[in-house]
């Protein structure tokens, strides 16, 4: 098979984006359908590809990143890759659904955010309509595509989320590594928005500034602007497994539904916190933010969910602020500086939710409470069950609300069984930002990646 290399002189354009686009266009015209981007860029004589604008991908196209380093060009404000029909009228129809797009990394393939262009979410609030939206800062951005595969790529200090999907189906995301240090707001890893279905997300490593993997189906904003006629708002049938990562103050796995969109048929198997940073929570279902409180959620908005095999030292192991049905969470172990094992927010309601096999071995003196359930006298709890819980040491077992737990073993209680008051936990989020709200922050980082720069990691404790 004839191989097409983007570095060939016949494809050279005014910049690296045009060069790669020329190679992609030729691969489409000839039916070869594959472009290799090598490490060395013959046009510039450097082992670097600077992309000032997005490369638009047609259907039946494979991009091989052969150990190359792709970077957002200075002052650019565009994606690196997106599908050709995105943001077109055709792309909002079933007839315009693209298919069979692959981006495969070989060797040490990197995608780099480069020098930030200074456009943040706050910038849009301060200057509405002046700049393109934040979705244009995302390196890999796709809408209305089926049969996709992205794997074998490392992401370094992306300007916003690293990957984003709307209305895509039958997608494999595998062997992706993130090194986002929380320098900027919303440095998520993978974001699935409305209309995503039949995804497998696996073997994800590294650390992110915000959520590592987020399923946020919100029926407004870009999800509304990209709405595909004939597809629903719902995100469903998603499998997430073997996530070995941490977040700077946010969730390792995050679920959120708003505006009438739903999420269902979800499986998560294997979350391991790497302690590179302080994750706010290993698992966040819903939110406690009043901004998302209207309209009230239904039990069927978040349903048919299985989450198992979670090992974490995050501030809160599990956080639930959602109305949900038919949910199973099992085999959760906490260690290190974990402060709350399970946090139920005031808006938590459920029908058939079970949490079982919870082991709390947090660093001595760190675990404030095993269960913290906000007060809500009108809360609907039907078939709510917690069982098989072992706690090595905690200040309190219950905070704010007590409820039945089957087979609960607590080896050491430092202060009391129950306390009827809220506390404010310190937050790691935002303390790591080099820039936030469009401004440079000075001396904002703690001396290490824990809450106050003094807590020791499990490895440090084991070495003593």
Ranges and model annotations:
Residues 1-464:
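Extracellular/periplasmic carbohydrate-active domains that bind, remodel
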């Amino acid at each position: 098979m004839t191989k097409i290399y983007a570095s060939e002189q016949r494809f050279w354009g005014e910049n690296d984006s045009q060069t790669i686009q020329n190679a992609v266009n030729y691969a489409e015209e000839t039916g070869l359908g594959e472009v290799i981007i090598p490490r060395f860029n013959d046009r510039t004589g450097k082992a670097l590809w600077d992309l000032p604008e997005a490369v638009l991908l047609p259907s039946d196209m494979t991009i091989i990143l052969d150990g190359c380093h792709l970077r957002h060009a200075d002052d650019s404000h565009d994606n690196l890759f997106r599908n050709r029909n995105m943001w077109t009228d055709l792309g909002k129809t079933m007839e315009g659904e693209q298919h069979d797009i692959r981006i495969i990394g070989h060797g040490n393939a990197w995608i780099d955010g480069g020098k930030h262009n200074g456009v943040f979410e706050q910038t849009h609030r301060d200057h509405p309509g002046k700049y393109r939206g934040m979705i244009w800062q995302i390196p890999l951005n796709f809408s209305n595509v089926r049969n996709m595969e992205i794997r074998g790529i490392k992401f370094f200090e992306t300007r916003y989320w690293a990957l984003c999907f709307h209305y895509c189906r039958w997608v494999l995301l595998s062997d992706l590594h993130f090194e986002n240090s929380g320098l900027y707001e919303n440095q998520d890893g993978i974001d699935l928005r409305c209309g995503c279905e039949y995804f497998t997300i696996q073997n994800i490593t590294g650390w992110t500034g915000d959520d590592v993997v987020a399923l946020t189906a919100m029926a407004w904003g870009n999800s509304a602007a990209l709405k595909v006629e004939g597809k629903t708002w719902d995100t469903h049938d998603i499998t997430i497994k073997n996530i070995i990562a941490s977040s700077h103050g946010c969730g390792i796995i995050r679920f959120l539904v708003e505006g009438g969109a739903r999420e269902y048929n979800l499986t998560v198997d294997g979350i391991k916190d790497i302690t590179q940073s302080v994750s706010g929570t290993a698992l966040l279902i819903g939110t406690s933010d009043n901004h998302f409180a209207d309209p009230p959620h239904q039990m069927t908005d978040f349903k048919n969910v299985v989450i198992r095999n979670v090992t974490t030292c995050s501030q809160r192991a599990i956080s639930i602020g959602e109305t949900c049905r038919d949910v199973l969470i099992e085999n959760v172990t906490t260690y290190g500086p974990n402060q709350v094992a399970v946090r139920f927010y005031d808006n938590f309601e459920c029908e058939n939710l079970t949490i079982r096999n919870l082991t709390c071995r947090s660093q001595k003196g760190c675990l404030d409470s095993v269960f913290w359930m906000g007060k809500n006298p009108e809360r609907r709890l039907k078939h709510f069950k917690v069982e098989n819980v072992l706690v090595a040491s905690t200040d309190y077992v219950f905070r704010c609300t007590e409820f039945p737990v089957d087979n609960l073993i607590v080896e050491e209680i430092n202060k009391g069984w129950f306390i009827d008051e809220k506390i404010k936990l310190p937050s790691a989020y935002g303390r790591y930002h080099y820039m936030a709200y469009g401004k440079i922050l000075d001396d904002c980082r703690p001396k290490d990646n824990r809450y106050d720069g003094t807590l020791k990691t499990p490895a440090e404790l084991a070495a003593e």
